[in-house]
Amino acid sequence: MDYKNKELCRLRTISFFLTLHKDKTQWEDALYSVKRDVDLLLPAVQKAGYTLQSIRVITNPFGEYLDLTNLQTAKADLQYLTELLNKFNESGIRIRFAIGAARNTEEIALLPELIAAYGDLCNACVNVPLDENGVLDNELIEQSVYAVQRIANITPRGEGNFNFTVNFNCKPFIPYFPAGYHLSHLPNSFVIGLETPDLLVEVLKSVPKSPHNQFYADCYQAMSQALQYHVDQVLEMLSAVKLSGKFEFAGIDSSAAPSKNCSSITKIYELMGLPYFGAAGSVEVSALLTKVFKSIQRVPLVGFSGLMLAVTEDLGLAEGTQKQYFDIRALLTYSAVCGIGLDTVPVAGNAKAESIAAIMRDTGTMAFRLNKPLTVRLFPIPNKVAGEISEFESDDLCNCRLLHIPD
């Protein structure tokens, strides 16, 4: 199939970054401004031959606009936002909502019950900084671990942790959930994220075998050229649309967002000569893929713009856990040269809080030391131990063998 075929590249998301204020009477107009631009963008996307999978709205920190007097007042505000989102959802495209970052331990403590109640309309993150000595804020980490464990225990099969992550060295304008957040001093903006595993797999099929260095150079060139073509097509589409002016275009996240419904990222490793993802050589391929995503020109690259290894969202990675092709240490190693950290990793329900906190600190230390955005999104599975298989029912998740966190 020709790499220019639009079926090989989908628009995973158009994500709108929006500031909300305490005055709830302004919320309807704010969300309507998103709808207005969606109504302008959707026909342009379709005319260009692409498929748009989701619209996402990402706000400033929820403590700046939700009434956090108590859990009930916060839920009431989220209920109102849910009603507004449902009111404006006329396109039939999936709408997802992120309430931004929790800024302190008190706000983190509210998240389990809010996520349990509102799920995919209540995605949230925590941004953990370094202190003056270059050490991660362990109080925020420990409260985040409590939230992860609480979410696991009060949502079916622990699936609520799909909507919560801990960020390290992550900047605004990540279009993906739940790591995306907005800051109120930044302009309202939108970002486009792509789903391209099918594209990358297809182009690699036609790269002829040659000696290692030449083969890897050819693989890089083929993937970079194909990805740049579709980015240029998206930019051409945007240039032809006259939007409302309420949102600035902030850029594209060039990551190959994974999905149950497209090629596995592991197929790329196999096409590049590895027996499986996790075998010796996986770091080298991961680094080359990251180079591909960073090669995109003529547009600001925002978000992760790197290799996403989301374990429970990728059928090949999920299968790899069951075959014991890799472990948590391997995922952390690959994060040194690529994207996202420990993302959607299922672990034992009885994993120690101290061990989860320690693996978060390891990931965060790597993020700041190597100056890259990394996240930790773990799924403790109640009543299961490492080595057992998850029993997820969510349409977004693949079942995996639970990985062990080294004590």
Name each model-derived stretch.
Residues 1-407:
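Anaerobic metallocofactor- and corrinoid-dependent redox/one-carbon enzyme cores
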